[in-house]
Amino acid sequence: MFASTVFVSLLAVAAAVPTNPQGQSCGNGNTVHCCNAETANKLTKGGILGALDLSNLLGQCNDVTAAVAGGAVPIKNTCSSQAVCCGEIHQNGLVNLGCTPIFV
């Protein structure tokens, strides 16, 4: 009985601990980008990729302006889709995984 009381008490305390909110900045020298399903036109203009409809699969992310990155404007008001932290923005390839989402 005592063990279950201690367990429930610890569970209640752990649930009540405030978490750090996901900020509007990225660590480790990464930059914030908005991914609003912007198509990669330079990849789909000609050749074999031009014949395929890859506009829904290929995309890029826009840099977030200094006012947004500095916290003057909330990211959720700027990004209509998803804000991400990118460390490797110079990517060459078909599948690039240099960004991680941040939740706002």
From Swiss-Prot:
One of its GO terms (cellular component) is extracellular region. SMART domains: HYDRO (SM00075). It comes from the Eukaryota. This is Class I hydrophobin 4. It comes from Cordyceps militaris (Caterpillar fungus). It holds the Pfam family Hydrophobin. Belongs to the fungal hydrophobin family. One of its GO terms (molecular function) is structural constituent of cell wall. Induction: Shows a very low expression except at the early stages of fruiting body development. Expression responds positively to light irradiation. Disulfide bonds join 26-85, 34-79, 35-61, 86-99. It is found in: Secreted; Secreted, Cell wall. Keywords: Cell wall, Conidiation, Disulfide bond, Secreted, Signal, Sporulation. InterPro entries: Hydrophobin. Self-assembles to form functional amyloid fibrils called rodlets. Self-assembly into fibrillar rodlets occurs spontaneously at hydrophobic:hydrophilic interfaces and the rodlets further associate laterally to form amphipathic monolayers. Residues 1-16 form the signal peptide. Aerial growth, conidiation, and dispersal of filamentous fungi in the environment rely upon a capability of their secreting small amphipathic proteins called hydrophobins (HPBs) with low sequence identity. Class I can self-assemble into an outermost layer of rodlet bundles on aerial cell surfaces, conferring cellular hydrophobicity that supports fungal growth, development and dispersal; whereas Class II form highly ordered films at water-air interfaces through intermolecular interactions but contribute nothing to the rodlet structure. The gene is HYD4. Disruption phenotype: Does not affect the mycelial growth rate, the hydrophobicity of the mycelia and conidia, or the conidial virulence on silkworm pupae. Leads to thicker aerial mycelia in darkness and quicker growth rates under abiotic stress. Promotes conidia production and increases the contents of carotenoid and adenosine. Increases the biological efficiency of the fruiting body by improving the fruiting body density.
